[in-house]
Structure formats: structure tokens, C-alpha cells
């Protein structure tokens, strides 16, 4: 625990010296300790809760409960979108329920994904048979599900826009539509399907046709 406190303190100090958030991002697993290491740091050091960001909070009910407690203490949590068509539905419903708990502020919850990160593939015996990658489409799908369940679109979008921008010290640059900000604009149709996309003012997708391609794309 002392090592974790020292790590968080070092990250905060580095952030102060470099004028950056000094954020420690932690990938949470299924362990019984849940967010205990984070609460230990908050109880035994002067590191602010905003410097500690646990991810994959939707992994299990106990972790969700601990995440809600962290938000109530002024901390931030990151909820990872599901990685397949089945998981994205269940995780989106977990997120919807979490956001409607008492004293869980939307201003302190972000959403991310494992987009393009490698993922193991397993057979029916649980043996790893190869690798695949996670798709970014499940962030978009999660937004659609949240709105379907009754969340206002502007609230759902905040998980991916203004809240992470504030947390990462990019307020007024990312996550907003404003003069002088990066012109990252997503145009949705009436069914919240992607119609067009602008990345820093350049057309990446226009009326569902990809215009901006990577180095190895045709």
C-alpha cells in the first residue's frame, strides 16, 4: 500500500511540474480488494481523488458499488464498454443503473473501450486459440442503448466528451464545440447512426462513406 501512495504522490508531483493532470490510471480486475488500494491512498496521503482513475468498473457488482463510493468521495471512475454484441448490452444497462444511483455525478464518470487492443480468443474448453482485437463501435452502441433506456442524448455524450476532457486537462480543446477547440465533430441521423465525421476539421466520413484512410488502408 505504501508503494501505491508513493506512486500516486509521484504522479501528482509530476503533473504539478509539467502542468498536466498527473493521473494514475488503474486497470481493475476481479480481486476481492476492489478499490481498497485507492481508498488507502486517499486515507493516508494528500493525493486528491481526481488523480486516481480506475477503469473497467463494470466488471462485477462489488466493483460497481466501490466505484459509486469513490465518486461520492469526489473521485472519477471509467466504465469500459462491452467488447461484443452481447456484452455491450449488459454493460450499458449496468452503466445506466450506476448513473441513476444517489449522489453519483455524471461529471465524475467517463467511458472508454479497449478499441484496437488485442483480445484472446477461446474455444469451448476455455483454451486460447488465437488473438483478435476490440472494436471501437461499442462506444457508439453504448450511447444508443443509454438513450433507448431514457437517458438524454446530451447526458450520454458527456461520458465521452466534456467529462474526460476536464479530467485530462483538455477543457475547451476537446469534448466541446467552441471557437478555438479541435473540430472533432460526429454527425448522427435521427436513429443515432453515424452519418459523417470530422477529425480536427478534416472530413473523415461523409454521408457514411469513409474519406480519410490509414496508411495501410485502400
Residue map of PLM features:
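Active-site core of metal-dependent hydrolases
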Residues: 8-120, 128-129
Amino acid at each position: 500500500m505504501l508503494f501505491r501512495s508513493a506512486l500516486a504522490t509521484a504522479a501528482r508531483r509530476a503533473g504539478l511540474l509539467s502542468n498536466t493532470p498527473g493521473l494514475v490510471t488503474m486497470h481493475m480486475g476481479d480481486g476481492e480488494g476492489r478499490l481498497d488500494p485507492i481508498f488507502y491512498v486517499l486515507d493516508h496521503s494528500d493525493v486528491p481523488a481526481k488523480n486516481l482513475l480506475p477503469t473497467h468498473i463494470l466488471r462485477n457488482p462489488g466493483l460497481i458499488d466501490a466505484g459509486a463510493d469513490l465518486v461520492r468521495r469526489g473521485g472519477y471512475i471509467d466504465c469500459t464498454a462491452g467488447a461484443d454484441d452481447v456484452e455491450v448490452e449488459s454493460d450499458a444497462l449496468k452503466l445506466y443503473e450506476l448513473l441513476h444511483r444517489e449522489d453519483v455525478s455524471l461529471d465524475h464518470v467517463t467511458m472508454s473501450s479497449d478499441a484496437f487492443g488485442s483480445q484472446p480468443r477461446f474455444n469451448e474448453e476455455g483454451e486460447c486459440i488465437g488473438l483478435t482485437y476490440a472494436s471501437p463501435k461499442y462506444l457508439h452502441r453504448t450511447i444508443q442503448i443509454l438513450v433507448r433506456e431514457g437517458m438524454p442524448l446530451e447526458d450520454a455524450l458527456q461520458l465521452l466528451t466534456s467529462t474526460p476532457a476536464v479530467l485530462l486537462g483538455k477543457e475547451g480543446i476537446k469534448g466541446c464545440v467552441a471557437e478555438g477547440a479541435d473540430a472533432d465533430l460526429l454527425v448522427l441521423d435521427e436513429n443515432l447512426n453515424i452519418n459523417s465525421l470530422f477529425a480536427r476539421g478534416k472530413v473523415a466520413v461523409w454521408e457514411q462513406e469513409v474519406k480519410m484512410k490509414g496508411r495501410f488502408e485502400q
